[in-house]
Amino acid sequence: MRYRYFAGVLVAAVLLLPAQGLAQHVVGTPALTDGSDGGFQVPLNTDPIYRLPTGRAGDSGFYTAAEFVMLTQTRDFGSQTIAVRGFFDSAGALTGVPGLFVGSGTEALNTRDLSRQSYQPGFNVEIGYRFDNGMRLFFNYMQLIETHASLGATLVPPLFRGPSGLADSFLTAPVFNFPPNFAGPARKVAGFGDYQVYGIWNGASTMDIRIAQRYQEMNAGYRIPLLETDYSRIYGAAGGRFAWFFERFQWWTASYDLDGNLQPQFAARYTNTLSQRMYGPFLGCGHEIFILNQFSLSTDLTAAMLFDVAKIRAKYQLGDNVPADISTQSKFGREEFRIVPNLNAAVNLWWYPVEGVQIRVGYQALMFFNTLHMNEPVGFNYGNIDPSYKVKEFRLLHGFNAGIGFFF
């Protein structure tokens, strides 16, 4: 009877006294970092509980992410004089020598004066699927909003200064070999007869130049875990990449007549477009470390060998709304092909506020080698347009990103 009593007391003590369970977190050890599900687990916020339709980041399933990016790239083109102040006495009416220049010849418009750098806002979206073993299939797309820089010159020189006769109130560019459609107004300079100052670009009133740039990138591939511990993981990535640099230079010229009137056929437009689409495989790796409760820091590096298809297009044409019977244009185009090495690097700080939600902010740099750039965007020979392009050894886009992702 005595033994039965002690046995009953022992059983009650085992059942009622608190003990450590397998699902309990012991003070001093990181929660949910045992890697038992095959992926890196950042501690989750369980107090309070948010009823969101998301899953755990370590579980298999679909995920999606969107972020804002703000990147900058330099505008690299050479120094080319577009226009000077004065005009050519094309008929020799004033100077007695056809083609002699009248005026100071002071530079009025040069491509080097365009803004060399600006930030481009944009977005990056990604969708993918995560498997139980930690491997991910993904597709992402980044688009930067087109950015512009412009510059202009008019008939008013700085402080109204210039030689007597007001020759510097006219702008001239050395365009030649153009058809009569681009003759411009019959009379635009006082004291000269009809077409004695010949051509829209000779003795013009206003000129404007503008450069536009944009960038797009797409990646499709997979990411696999390589090495994991309770506090960090190393992973590899591979796939295909598409990158696209688009640049367009535009130049508008307006030549008013002697009475200050502007007809559609008295204006001309020049356009130079450089489009570089690049395709190729990429290979990379990344490292993520747990630094604080719900926070981690990651670094990523990918290298790609891209095949660049560069399309070059340049065109002279009359202004808008020109009658069809006098409308004309001159076109130039060619393609170039080259190999462009590419290196992308990123550093991101991650925050995991609730299950299935990830927020990150970071910095990224996109480096390209052996791309083309406009050295002298304008070819002044209307009949044989030949702008100058050169190889740019190094091109850099860099800036910041911030976004959010969801696991389902």
Regions found by a protein language model. Give the residues of each.
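Extended serine/threonine-enriched, polar tracts that run as long, contiguous segments within proteins
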Residues: 276-358, 366-368
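Outer-membrane beta-barrel biogenesis signature
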Residues: 23-65, 224
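Extracellular/periplasm-exposed beta-strand and loop segments of Gram-negative cell-envelope proteins
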Residues: 77-85, 91-118, 145-214, 245-277, ...
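Outer-membrane beta-barrel strand-turn architecture
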Residues: 58, 131-133, 226-230, 289-293, ...
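Hydrophobic, lipid-facing positions within transmembrane beta-strands of outer-membrane proteins
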Residues: 62, 121-125, 216-220, 279-283, ...
